[in-house]
């Protein structure tokens, strides 16, 4: 591999890693705000993602320029395709986190009683956060990252995510049925929490893309 091309790949990987770190920071602060009822932190959490779209576009542009300048062969082409798709997944995760943070703030300020599902929300959020942290660790240590092991770890978190969401969905459906005029607010909460469920799916997609980049084979991702 040409040194200039390898340097460009490392630069793109670093840009993706930085974008992911901003999403993680936003997720951590949103979780802290919810756990500790620190409503002022929600806006701070979203500020980490204020340049999300432009940052993702800049990464895409670098990838496209690399395609054009270096004409990569099969293995390198596979890596660039994976990076391009990963950026799209991160953009969607970040956008989902921004909306989740905003809506969770609204639920908290609205005084809606979420006590019956508070612990489950926290655990659900942690599964999505752990998956993102595993992805970040892999991007930070290219030589040490075992993509197969990463995929297994992220799948474990996604499985926990699914189980927790199912539990919480049942609790919320009970609240929707029994809460009269507040039912519509609990429907909104259910929609908010689906953002975390989708984040888990997209984290699996990124792990699958890293596995594809490292090992090849068929690529299977959630739509």
Predicted regions and their residues:
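Cytosolic, long alpha-helical scaffolding segments
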Residues: 1-223
